[in-house]
Amino acid sequence: MSTFTLFHVVISLVGIGAGLIVIFGFLSGMKLPYSNALFLVMTIATSVTGFFFPYHGITPGIVVGIVSLVILALAVLALSKRWTKTYIVSCIAAEFFNVMVLIVQSFQKIPALHALAPTGKEPIVAVCQGAELVVFAVLAWIAIRKKAFLLR
């Protein structure tokens, strides 16, 4: 693994960890400003550094990176304007995309998972991504309905 790839992976994992803490804050009503800042910075950095890998045409990774940056721009705007619901949904959506990439990369790089899905198009990958979508959608729904977190 190159130094750049290792850097990209580390900031991605830090962003995912911070994102989970941020979601906990949404659910518990805690603002956690340092975790929010770390999540936004690391997740933006992850998306940006993803564009510095060798270009082989438009790939799902490039599309996810673009979508993620648009969502993160919305999160930053929502934070500055104190749009609580928009901030919650955009942060959880950005975390969803980060974890989705983690799932795909795990099936590509971890030998035991790769044996289950050598092409990445096997049903097990779709099941994992579908389960992830359900979990993050439920977390967003609970966070919005609970109204524990406010940007005021």
Predicted regions span which residues?
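Polytopic transmembrane helical bundles with strong interfacial aromatic enrichment
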Residues: M1-L113, A117-R152
